[in-house]
Amino acid sequence: MPARPSYKKAIQYLYSLEKYGIRLGLKRIKTFLKSLGNPQDRLNLIHVAGTNGKGSTCALIESVLIRAGYKVGLYTSPHLVRFNERIRINGKEITDKKIVELVERIRCKIQDARFKIKDSEKNLKPVTCNLQLTFFEFTTAMAF
């Protein structure tokens, strides 16, 4: 059994995705989230958008909902010091261990989507799918 990658390697992998830049559109993330069973559809979400004040607004909403007894997830970007700041559950940052686990799980799922094996006349052939997530798409999938 191969050794699990370290937090440092997981973060390095995430930042390596920045080479794919920003790609407009939702097709890739929708396709990928569908392969995960559309986890976003099982959540009640508040999407905060705009130019200024998103972080403060989200922190306020998070605080109010936690005090009201809700389980609250918060996904923000960018982070200030550590990547872990981007994903919080009930005010607590995601752990290094959980980041490593999620990066590996999503990498494997992408690999499965890219190289599905198809049985054609008793010959196994790899079938390539173009599913390369950007940094933002990958980290969004982690949050779900």
Tell me what each language-model feature is.
Residues S6, K54, F136-T139:
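Generic hydrophobic secondary-structure packing signal
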Residues L26, K30-D41, R67-F144:
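ATP-dependent carboxylate-amine ligase catalytic core
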